[in-house]
Swiss-Prot record:
UniProt superkingdom: Bacteria
Protein name: 1,4-dihydroxy-2-naphthoyl-CoA hydrolase
Lineage: Bacteria, Bacillati, Cyanobacteriota, Cyanophyceae, Oscillatoriophycideae
Xref: Pfam families: 4HBT_2
GO molecular function: 1,4-dihydroxy-2-naphthoyl-CoA thioesterase activity; fatty acyl-CoA hydrolase activity
Species of provenance: Crocosphaera subtropica (strain ATCC 51142 / BH68) (Cyanothece sp. (strain ATCC 51142))
Amino acid sequence: MTYNRTIHFSDTDAAGVVYFAAFLSICHEAYENSLQVAGIDLKTFFTSSDIAIPIVHADIDFYQPLFCGDRIQINLTPTQLNETEFEIKYQVFNENNLDKLIAKATTKHVSINPKIRQRTSLSLSITQWLRSNQDDC
């Protein structure tokens, strides 16, 4: 799954490069977009009282700076780890050079019952989303 985006001024820090926390937000945008493309209603997904899917780990590696106005392509690859967890790997390229990796990130997600804060199986819609995106890879 790919997601294309322009780096905005609000994504940058005082040095004029993308701020690391803003980059995680951009990755989350790509994740949300992939859910929406798969037919998952985002409002229902993020406000469900039965299941929550928090991010429990995130990491980023930058290989060159990103500036306001840069056009990027994010390739995301979700992988189910077990019945309650999945991770998403993000690879970021400049749209003008898709051969050179600019940055990479990983987010790990865990399905929980928000009422009792215990792990629960991934929902059918997320399992289907994971399978459909793994078939693309």
